[in-house]
Amino acid sequence: MGLWDIDKIPYVGREKGPQEGLAFHYYDADKVVAGKKMKDWLRFGVAWWHTFDQQLVDPFGTGTAQRPWYGKYSDPEDEALAKVDYAFEFFQKLGVEYFCFHDRDIAPEGDTLRETDKNLDKVVDKIEENMKSTGIKLLWNTSSLFTNPRFVSGASTSPFADIYAYAGGQLKHSLEIAKRLGAENYVFWGGREGYENLWNTQMKREQEHMAKFFHMCHDYAKEIGLDAQFLIEPKAKEPTMFQYDFDAATAINFLRTYDLMDVFKLNLEGNHANLAGHTYQHEIRTAREAGVLGSLDANQGDKLIGWDMDEFPTDLYETSTVMWEVLAEGQIGPHGGLNFDAKPRRTSFTAEDLFRSHIAGMDSFAAGLLVAAKMHEDKVIENLQAERYSSFDSGIGATVENGTASLASLEEYALDIPQSKLIEATKSDHLESVKATINNYMIDALAEA
């Protein structure tokens, strides 16, 4: 059995009933869908922090998690090293080829940055050994510039220069680790890069400091030969009242303002989209059309609760819309994947639940891929959209698109059109039928799986 009292998770399809929770019903890693293997479309990654560090605490109670390494180690460094073995066996039994981590997820902090880096390097040594022996790769790493109390007012936006300097030193070593481990991406999530109250905040100054920080990071990455794609992860709020990377559109505006569009793409999360008042599909479409889709965090929120819940994704409608966008793009960014930034519920506390929850998420996205592939094969959305905007393919509409129209030419065209003709020019969306069509594709595609 190994360190986990569970066998490698098999693909069973319809061989077992729908209640079998320790097998894949839709995720068949090597199955070719829309010209690529499932595993290559989805590129699943496991999040170290939720999977191996999360104790399932909530604001009203202590942790309920039961993990096989609990109670075995009195020294945090020994436990950190042991968790590397548990992690890589978990990845292999789940059949996942990527993982992600924050620097402070994998090793305990010391009193100084020098001590902390030393602790970190010991664990990185062991991670590197396991990566070489298993072939498992680092989708992305990042630096935790929000958990320690020193970051109470931010890191790159902190009003305290000593904290800014510490953040820079911490980030420098994190980039060196990315280089060493061959990270395909590097993520910046500004958990406390925002404000609690505008009265004591110089917002422009803080954002300028953050932009300078990002440019320093890019300069150092070039210096050491790190070619990982830099990613910003937008989030509207939590833990701050307002974060500067509120949503995809806000982050894109920041990148354009500070000459960073050629450096960064976006890492988008479903639950974060909800916190900004958007759907996951909206955020992905916004990034795609700006050319900055980088990677995805796979989770969902509860639509009735305005919190960052980090639930495992089980909403097939949402996974289908996400994968429709991914297939339209051709990939999840240049080097992106689907990282499960998700944790089991507090009542799902056994070690086995870590497998069950990841299986649920992986199957949900595999099912979404099958639905999206069928929709793209039939060009149902492409044809619908082409018909809706067809008036811009010729006549006055074509002059708008080719740039020859002017207000004068539009006026001349419209002056004598009666209202009856204008109303006649509009067409019904048949929106309810469109929504029903999506449902029908979900049912039909999964029935054929």
From Swiss-Prot:
Cofactor(s) needed by this chain: Mg(2+)
Positions that bind Mg(2+) 1: 233, 269, 297, 341
GO biological process: D-xylose metabolic process
Disulphides: none
Residues the entry annotates as binding Mg(2+) 2: 269, 272, 308, 310
Cofactor note text: Binds 2 magnesium ions per subunit.
GO molecular function per UniProt: magnesium ion binding; xylose isomerase activity
Signal sequence region: none
Keywords tagged on the record: Carbohydrate metabolism, Cytoplasm, Isomerase, Magnesium, Metal-binding, Xylose metabolism
Catalytic residues (UniProt): 102, 105
EC number assigned by the record: 5.3.1.5
GO CC field: cytoplasm
Entry-linked InterPro entries: Xyl_isomerase-like_sf, Xyl_isomerase-like_TIM-brl, Xylose_isom_bac, Xylose_isomerase
Listed Pfam families: AP_endonuc_2 (PF01261)
Complexes and interactors: Homotetramer.
Family: Belongs to the xylose isomerase family.
NCBIfam families referenced in this protein's UniProt entry, alphabetically: PRK05474.1, xylose_isom_A
Protein name: Xylose isomerase
Organism: Bifidobacterium adolescentis (strain ATCC 15703 / DSM 20083 / NCTC 11814 / E194a)
